[in-house]
Amino acid sequence: MDVLASSDPPSSGAFKPELSAALDPLLAFLSKTGSPFLVNPYPYFAYQDDPRPDTLAFCLFQPNAGRPDAGSGLTYTSMFDAQVDAVRAALDAKGYKDVEVVVAETGWPHSGGADEAGASVENARAFVSNLVSHLRSMVGTPRMPGKSVDTYLFAVYDEDLKPGKASEKSFGLFQTTLTETYPTGLMRNGTAGLAPAPAPTVRPASPPPAIPQVTPVQPQPSAASAATAPPRHVRSAAELPRTISALHVSACF
C-alpha cells in the first residue's frame, strides 16, 4: 500500500509519481499478460494510526455510520473495501481498468505489546471471520460491486523468530498442533479435518493365479502358398513394451 500517494477518500487513490519508472512498465506487463496487481491491505495498521472506537468498528466489518466518499458519491462501511478501492482508483487513473486487484496478504494479530492497540484474539477473530463472510457474500466493494476480490490470509502460523514488535509475530491462524488459534469460519468441520491421516492398511499380496500353458498348433502352409505369400512382420518382445508406453504417455497428456 506504500505505493499510493493518496488513498483517503478511496476515489482519490493515486500512485506516487516518483515510482512511475518502476510501476509503469510493471502495469503495462500485467495488462498485456492478463495478470493481476497484488496488494497487501492491512486495516490493522490503519487502526494503529487512528485508534478510535469508530475506526475499530470500521476496520473489523462491524456496524458503523459509514464514511462517505465525496469524490465518487459512494459510502464505505469497511476499511478493507476502502483500501482495495483506493488501489482500484489508482489503476483506473493510470488507464489500467483491465488489471484486476488481488489481495496477496491481509490479516490481524491475535496478540501484541502493551503499546499495540487492538491486537487481541477477539479482534483477530472478528476481522477474519467477518472478512470471510464479506467475501463469501459476493457483494464486492462499493467501486466493484457484485464480485468477490481474491484474497489470501496472512498467516498460517505465528512467526516467533520474526524481529520487531510482538504483533508482527502473532498473525497465525493455526497452532503447530493443527488446531485453530481462534474460530475463523474457514473450516467446514472445525479442526477435525486437519488431523493427520491414518496410516494406510496394507493387505498381504495374494499369489497370482496360475496361467495354464497352451502350446498353439501352427498350421503348415502348403509349398505353393509359402512361396507366394508376402513375408509377415511379427513384433518382437522388445517392440511391444514401447507401443504400450507410447499409448500410456499419450493418455496422460
Feature annotation, model-predicted:
Residues M1-L38, P43-E100, S111-D150, A155, ...:
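Plant P/S/T-rich low-complexity glycomodules
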Residues G107:
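Catalytic metal-binding/acid-base residues of hydrolase active sites
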